[in-house]
């Protein structure tokens, strides 16, 4: 597995797909300097009507959410995101997580940078980022606040909350063993063709130099499975308003995991939407306009 660090150039005119973002860095509790991006809301909405703190998915980076940021900005909503350690322009071995708690520290640092006094803010995560956001909210924010402010809600886009239905139990157990004895074993690759039905999205991903196209190390995959089990144990305590959406034809994360989470979460205000025919990235798929419209509507309804 490649262990190179990301480019250090974070100047406003540096290359990368972060159009419109204000760039800086934020330091985690364990001393990692993460690349931080803030897409401001439209000029007519300052301060913004709401702020969304986003954790991206495995092997991608925050810049892929620039189109989402533009749509949110039109609605007066600010988007703030980091490149998780080992992703995008943040330092560290590519897509390596010695523990899922490393990503939780990244998310904690993001929230510290994203929260504004008197502005409603939302936790959001896509795919593995959804795992991180859900685990953080359930373990650390049940009946509590983040940086002195209680989040207005939790938004999960195609979250990785359960192993695939076709994955046998022995394979899950074997992944834990391999993670211990050969943690950097190249376990799998992500096929861009499974992201969306839009060929332009697939090709853009294939050609994006900040996306990790190599194999995912066994330890990282095993730690995501560990996070799933931790979420199962604590989800009943999660009392924030929750929005979960997933594509019915997602082959990268399990839609049934979202259904089960919505049934078992402690929140009395949980909305689940399964988009028929959509692949993994519903916000980039052919029906993305209605997906993002529904997201904006939900945020607006929970920002009062």
Predicted features, each with a name:
Residues 126-216:
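Alpha/beta-hydrolase-fold enzymes
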Residues 238, 244-246, 250:
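Short beta-strand/loop motif that positions the catalytic acidic residue
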Residues 69-93:
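Conserved alpha/beta-hydrolase
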Residues 1-42:
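An N-terminal hydrophobic leader/cap segment in hydrolases
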Residues 59-62, 88-117, 291:
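Catalytic nucleophile-loop/oxyanion-hole region of alpha/beta-hydrolase
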Residues 52, 57-60, 128:
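Active-site glycine-rich loops that stabilize anionic/oxyanionic intermediates
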Residues 251-257:
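Conserved alpha/beta-hydrolase "acid-adjacent" motif
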Residues 269-304:
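Catalytic active-site module of serine/aspartate enzymes centered on a nucleophile-bearing elbow/loop
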């Amino acid at each position: 597995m490649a262990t190179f660090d990301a480019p250090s150039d974070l100047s406003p005119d540096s290359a990368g797909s972060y159009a419109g973002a204000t760039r800086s860095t934020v330091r985690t509790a364990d001393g990692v300097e993460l690349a931080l991006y803030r897409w401001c809301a439209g000029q007519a909405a300052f301060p913004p009507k709401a702020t969304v703190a986003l954790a991206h998915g495995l092997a991608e980076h925050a810049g892929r959410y620039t189109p989402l940021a533009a749509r949110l900005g039109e609605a007066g909503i600010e988007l703030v995101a980091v490149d998780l350690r080992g992703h995008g322009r943040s330092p560290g071995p590519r897509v390596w997580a010695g523990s899922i708690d490393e990503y939780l520290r990244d998310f904690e640092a993001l929230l510290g940078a994203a929260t504004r006094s008197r502005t409603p803010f939302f936790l959001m995560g896509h795919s593995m980022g959804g795992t991180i956001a859900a685990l953080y909210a359930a373990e650390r924010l049940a009946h509590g606040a983040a940086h002195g402010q209680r989040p207005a809600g939790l938004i999960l886009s195609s979250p990785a909350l359960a192993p695939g239905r076709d994955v046998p139990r022995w394979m899950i157990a074997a992944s834990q063993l391999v993670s211990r004895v050969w943690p950097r074993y190249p376990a799998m690759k992500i096929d861009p063709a499974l992201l969306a039905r839009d060929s332009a999205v697939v090709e853009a991903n294939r050609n994006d130099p900040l996306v990790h196209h190599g194999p995912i190390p066994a330890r990282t995959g095993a730690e995501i499975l560990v996070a799933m089990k931790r979420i199962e144990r604590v989800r009943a305590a999660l009392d924030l308003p929750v929005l979960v959406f997933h594509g019915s034809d997602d082959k990268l994360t399990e839609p049934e995991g979202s259904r089960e989470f919505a049934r078992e979460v402690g929140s009395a205000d949980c909305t689940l939407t399964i988009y028929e025919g959509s692949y993994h990235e519903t916000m980039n798929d052919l029906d993305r306009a209605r997906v993002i419209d529904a997201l904006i509507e939900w945020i607006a309804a929970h920002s009062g």
